[in-house]
């Protein structure tokens, strides 16, 4: 069983509907976020928790913000995906699941609108709702290293049901996937949510939150320039942490001339010398001087590995 690392509670999320005590899951090292839509306009009961995701985002239409409810730890498997016996793992495949309250079905949208039920139709969601999702994804990237990338194809519902848009991953593709996808992309499942949500805009907002830029659109004039490795998440750079990412960071600090605090060179264990070297690098960059605490975040990582 994996060991949980990093913060397990999304800041500001309510635990009024906490199900982990009754439906304990497996511990995981999360590297995937799956987005769902609830197909309802209020917080679901999830059968008392038996089919709950890790979190639910409920739009507060008057305040123009998302209210978050957390049901399981970030790195505890939740229960919102079909997981067939003997097939690929879904709920337990290093995935954090988020249900977005509202609908992706145009027929349901029209029905609710005619009945006067205020709701979010996620394929045409307002900016504040997309920004709320983006802030969560930015936090997941910063704290858990979930890549701000995902499938190119997000077909509209009902085409997305089953595999009508050809969007659903094979078992092998799912096992290799890292990043953000929809319920519509997960194998062994047939649901088509969240439909044609504006995924490109969500990623744009998430990257703006972190000031990391849009790597997919950046073209360099020097093809031989090494690609910046994906930021693994802050959880790997805490006191006593031992992992390959610490060594990779340390080697790059030495390469860039910021290894003065090492006595014998970088290692796999995060220590005070690493923090001081990172702080020296941060102080050398005007973009980072206001936050030179020695803890690497996405922007520090990108700038360090960009040359």
Can you say where each PLM-predicted feature lies in the sequence?
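Active-site-adjacent loop/helix surface patches within enzyme catalytic domains
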Residues: 2-148
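Basic/polar, cationic surfaces and motifs that engage anionic cell-wall
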Residues: 2-11, 103-227, 280, 296-307
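Second-shell loop/turn segments in exported
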Residues: 84-85, 115-127, 233-241, 263-268, ...
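Glycine-rich, acidic and aromatic/proline-enriched surface loops and short helix-turn segments
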Residues: 94, 99-104, 182, 186, ...
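Solvent-exposed, polar/charged alpha-helical surfaces in well-ordered, non-transmembrane soluble domains
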Residues: 131-138, 244-251, 255, 272-283, ...
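Acidic, Ser/Thr/Pro/Gly-enriched interdomain connector segments
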Residues: 212-268, 273
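Post-signal peptide N-terminal regions of Sec-secreted extracellular proteins
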Residues: 228, 234, 288-290, 305-307
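Extended, structured, electrostatic nucleic-acid-contact surfaces
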Residues: 280-292
């Amino acid at each position: 069983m994996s060991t949980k690392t990093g913060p397990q509670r999304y800041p500001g999320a309510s635990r009024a509907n906490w199900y982990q005590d009754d439906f304990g899951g497996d511990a995981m090292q999360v590297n995937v976020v799956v987005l769902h839509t609830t197909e309802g306009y209020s917080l679901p009961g999830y059968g008392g928790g038996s089919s709950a995701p890790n979190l639910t985002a409920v739009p507060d239409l008057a305040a123009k913000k998302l209210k978050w409810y957390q049901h399981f730890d970030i790195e505890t498997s939740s229960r919102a995906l079909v997981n067939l016996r003997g097939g690929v793992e879904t709920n337990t495949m290093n995935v954090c699941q988020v249900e977005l309250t509202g609908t992706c079905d145009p027929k349901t949208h029209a029905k609710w609108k005619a009945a006067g039920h205020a709701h979010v139709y996620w394929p045409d969601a307002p900016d504040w709702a997309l920004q709320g999702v983006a802030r969560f994804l930015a936090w997941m990237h910063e704290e858990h290293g979930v890549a701000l990338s995902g499938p190119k194809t997000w077909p509209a519902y009902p085409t997305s049901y089953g595999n009508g848009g050809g969007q659903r991953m094979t078992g092998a593709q799912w096992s290799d996937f890292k990043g953000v996808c929809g319920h519509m992309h997960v194998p062994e499942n047939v649901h088509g949510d969240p439909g044609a949500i504006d995924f490109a805009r969500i990623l744009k907002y998430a990257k703006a939150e972190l000031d990391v830029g849009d790597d997919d659109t950046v073209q360099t004039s020097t093809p031989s320039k090494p690609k910046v490795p994906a930021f693994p998440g802050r959880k790997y750079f805490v006191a006593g942490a031992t992992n390959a990412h610490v060594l990779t960071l340390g080697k790059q600090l030495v390469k860039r001339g910021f290894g003065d605090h090492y006595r014998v060179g970088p290692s796999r264990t995060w220590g005070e010398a690493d923090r001081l070297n990172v702080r020296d690098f941060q102080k050398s960059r005007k973009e980072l001087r206001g936050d030179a605490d020695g803890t690497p975040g996405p922007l520090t990582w990108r700038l360090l590995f960009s040359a």
